[in-house]
Amino acid sequence: MKHYLESIDNVCADAQSSVDGLSSQQAQERLEKDGKNKLAEGKKEPIILRFLKQFIEPMTLILIVAAIISGVLTAVNNASSAVKEFPSDVIIIMAVVIINAILGVAQESKAEKAIDALQKIAAATSKVVRDGKIVVVKSEDLVVGDVIVLEAGDAVPADARIIECASMKIEEAALTGESVPVLKTCDVIDAPSGEVPLGDRKNMAFMGSTVVYGRGKAIIVGTGMNTEMGKIANALTQAKEGKTPLQQKLSQLSKVLTYLVIGICVVIFAVSLIRAGVDGSLKADVAPTILNTFMIAVSLAVAAIPEGLATVVTIVLSIGVTNMSKRNAIIRKLTAVETLGCTQIICSDKTGTLTQNKMTVVDHYGSDENLLANAMSLCSDAEYDEEKGEAVGEPTECALVNYAALCNLNKNEQKNILVRVGEIPFDSSRKMMTTVHKDANGNALQFTKGAPDEIIKRCTFYLQDGKEVAMTPDKQDEILCANKEMADRALRVLAVAQKRLEAEKSEYTTENDEKDMCFVGLVGMIDPVRPEVKPAIDECRKAGIRPVMITGDHKDTAVAIAMQLGIITDPSQAITGAELDKISDEDFANDVEKYSVYARVQPEHKTRIVNAWRAKGYITAMTGDGVNDAPSIKNADIGVGMGITGTDVTKNVADMILTDDNFATIVSAVGEGRRIYDNIRKSIQFLLASNLSEVLSIFIATLAGFTIFKPAHLLWINLITDCFPALSLGMEAPESDVMSRPPRNSKDGIFANGMGFAISYQGVLITLITIASYFIGAKVLANMHHAEAIANGLYSAETLGSSMAFLTLSMAEIFHAFNMRSLHGSIFKIKKQNLWLWGAGVLSLLLTTLVVEVPFLANAFELAKLDGAEYGIAIALAISIIPMVEIVKAIARAIRKKKGIVLAA
């Protein structure tokens, strides 16, 4: 049943109750049957299960298999050899796997607290009519059919149809987005279509809202999960968190590397066995040959997989989190950092996000502004809080009292000068309220404020230069024109009139007193935009990001705000929730780009809008602060909650929280997100080019019949030499055009924008340098400086070649990290130095030198001692990677410029 369309009698019949409520026995029976008035709690995933899930990634599985094979080979060798080998490869690989798993669990951000926060919003106790008496019970014990008593300050404990009310206003901003409390009624709502937006159901009270004025009674028609709040809770539990663009790309990369590793390992294994069969070693010694071939395959697996990649990405994202926290953006989910960088659509709630969620007088009409402000202030029930320096009470009346304060008319002082001695309360039929005041001389003065059309027709005079002048048709038209001009700007307009009374009376009535009044003036109010939002939206557009307003407020207000901010240029770009309901999902998916303002929407509309943008391939962010924003925030690629005005529900499902509730902070966060994504790409390109060079080196060496690296060499380079520079690339400052580029396409793979080509050619260049260094060591230096040592059996020519290759590859990758400071520009044009990278380079060089120079480390890694000249050769070969890459980047820039290609952020 749509209770808002039914009479009170029909609602009572449907609830099997009456306006006198239930008996205690009836309530108990229903409680046992229907359950508590609570929201269902979602299932929480055990932490051990989350930990185990970290091990099912393809790259992780390959590392585990490599560790197992390496362990088996070590055990077999130790069983048949007098010299026992320490299983360092196994320990190092498994340590990397476990550390990555721990980091993965630690950084995951879950929305498990969302339902708990919804529970907190619900009232703890409520006043209810039981057995004909008003009693206080736990809100969770309320049932359908209970009649609840609502007064100012009460939280509404369940969804209920109002059956009695006296000037009752309910704050529903968190649920509907409506910034002004809703004046409630008992009357049936007339809706021929049968559909009424949540914010327009004025004879209903909803769980999670708050009574701010007046009093009333209501019969409960929905409890627990059968409330509007329950629908939101259900939407939260059903909303699935998809992978972010970076997670998708790393997952794709993982699969590519997995297939690549398996394919190359099979080829290498087959080639090695064929070679062994050809040279006869397979027949002579089958087991050792096969084991040695396995070892080569393990080396290849270790070389192909960038073990430090997951850790580097996590730490670089963490650096971004720290930087954003300094700019008032708290990241609850690491991957949100990079998602911000590719955001194409920002769906923003209006109330409290684009606006201040504070009604403010912004315009007035009348000859005496001070009298106008004072009359409005005194004819209200809001009070002025001296400590806070602002009014407290119903938002509209607070705006009037604050307006008077700005005119230096403090209500606390004025109400002592003009003491209230009588009133006629506001009601929805009259659309006005009246207060009567007495001055020190005993003179009585009446103020009446309300809807302009109602006030004007009761005025026979108007105030002009301090004098009361008889109202004329022309003056009335002038006032109505002023009213229309304000209303057309989506201002909420109130009028006020005064009347001098002969003496104070014991009773005041509409019929006798709200007539023959003197018109004083009009005020126009609105929830004003935040001053910093307009520049922020301009910045968004410059960065290629489209802002979209989604609000529960009225269409006229939404359009006015949106046009003021530059979100839309024409009212046709706005649509209401009711209009949206008439559009099929298929048609809406095709037309979603036509609209940038959605007014009078309900929670399910917000989720539908977000999903429509995402279905078209746009990376979508959703900002908001109310409970009604939570499902759409969770469904968006990135959810942005408000730290000050935001509800706990919204904060708990958001990926990012703005501690200053400042829309402009999003722009800063987008810039940081783009910087971080740039830097992650730099780190990934650096690591993959390095790993490719290792794979190619082993592949070429295997085909040529020599061993260039052992697993320990590759693990050292991947985990020690490469990790520090990769991390410091994450500290790189933003490039100058980072906020001038269009957002990148989320469908672009990890190798888009020439990254695949760059990794390939850079990997090949480093491979050529490494192979050249090996042959210089094994074929040239072995016959010169090391002939005696080799003859004495201290090490072999192959070991010398491996040592030169190890040193050269390590240093080449360190120097190559400097190439990665800009993926496309010249590093010699970067003005700001990255001191972190310099420090990482020096540290990596020192650690690599220690491995070669310290005897016990050199023995463990099976490296030969090198002299100064050989270091010079290795450095010369390694540093050549910088000019070679600079030349290729210069050629690529020239080609892009000629073809007019613009790179995305």
Task: Cite the ranges covered by each PLM segment.
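Membrane-water interface at loop-to-transmembrane-helix junctions
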Residues: 746-764, 794-804
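Helix-coil boundary and interhelical linker segments in multi-pass alpha-helical membrane proteins
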Residues: 702-710, 776-800
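Short N-terminal signal/transit or membrane-insertion segments
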Residues: 150-151, 781, 810
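Generic alpha-helical transmembrane segments
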Residues: 721, 800-817
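Alpha-helical transmembrane segments of multi-pass integral membrane proteins
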Residues: 79, 758-773
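Conserved cytosolic headpiece of P-type ATPases
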Residues: 1-743, 748-751, 764, 806, ...
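A C-terminal functional module that forms or caps the active site or interfaces directly
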Residues: 820
